[in-house]
Structures are given as C-alpha cells and as structure tokens.
C-alpha cells in the first residue's frame, strides 16, 4: 500500500493505492463526472484506490483533475519501480456501445503520452480537455509511456469512459506477474 499526500494553494490531495487489489474504490474529488471515470478505472484495473481531493472548484475543475493525475501517477511510480517480474507491456481495446478506444502501455520509466481523441467541449459540466490533462500528468509522474487512441465513437461520454477503461485493462495487463521475466529490459534496469 502506497500513501501520498500533496498540498498546494490550489489543491489538497490524499491517495492510498494498492496496485494488486480487487477494485475497491473510494473517490471524492468534488467533480462528479471525474469521480465516475476514476471509479471505472479502479474497477477494471483491479487497483484499490482511496483518493480525496479538495480543490479550488470555485475557479474550475482543471487544478483538481490535473493534480489528481500527478498524485496518482506518483503513487503508481512508487508501486511499480524498480520493475521486476511483470509483463511490462499492456494493451487493450475497450468498446462502449459505438465507441472504441485503444490503449498501449510500456512501464518504461520513460514518461510519454500520445493522446488522439476528439470529444465535445463539455460532457455535462465537465471540460473534456481535462481528460488529456489527467493522463498527461499521470504518465509523466508514473514514468510510463502511454498511448490512448480513439478508434471510433460519437458520444463523448462513451468515448471518455472507454478511454479510462482501456487504460485500466492495459495497466492491469502490464503489471501482471511473470516470475520468468526478471527485469523486463535488455538493459537490465528500468
């Protein structure tokens, strides 16, 4: 179990993370749609996540969503590195009705994000551009290479949810135990 806390003038965030959990989730960011997405991530990754964020929502959701990515990414990094006896790579295609999203992950300790998606400006009251901001912060702070590609879809809610679920499934596969793997790199270290 990894515990992280980060406090700034914009947000106060606490997270408890168990990457080899059962999908138990306690999320309270004050941003309803984002909570819904994090619950989906938790359920389909099988990570146990307790995350509480108090942010400056009177301004907008940006600081809360991005900073949750920073803190969750930092907790993931502490949980997975140094990498040993796991698959390292994971991928998935997740569909939700008409929407399909592909995710590929490399637990490389080389942070990078490729994000190709088009969504309506808003999903309810949620600024859809914050989905990219969240995954950018998560990838940079977790030290993972992350590709998220919208393959098809019209409904922005479906596309967003498929994105979080695709990440969850690919991450679960990347951290799958493989005792024969040792350090999964020809360099001998990640």
Curated annotation (Swiss-Prot):
Main location: cytoplasm
Domain of life where this protein originates: Bacteria
Gene Ontology CC entries for this record: cytoplasm
Keywords: Amino-acid biosynthesis, Cytoplasm, Histidine biosynthesis, Lyase
Organism: Campylobacter fetus subsp. fetus (strain 82-40)
E.C. number(s) listed in UniProt: 4.2.1.19
Subcellular location: Cytoplasm
PROSITE patterns linked: IGP_DEHYDRATASE_1, IGP_DEHYDRATASE_2
GO biological process: L-histidine biosynthetic process
GO molecular function: imidazoleglycerol-phosphate dehydratase activity
Membership in a protein family: Belongs to the imidazoleglycerol-phosphate dehydratase family.
Record's catalysed reaction(s): D-erythro-1-(imidazol-4-yl)glycerol 3-phosphate = 3-(imidazol-4-yl)-2-oxopropyl phosphate + H2O
HAMAP family hit by this protein: HisB (MF_00076)
Pathway: Amino-acid biosynthesis; L-histidine biosynthesis; L-histidine from 5-phospho-alpha-D-ribose 1-diphosphate: step 6/9
Enzyme class: lyase
Chain's gene name: hisB
Pfam families, alphabetized: IGPD
Protein name (record): Imidazoleglycerol-phosphate dehydratase
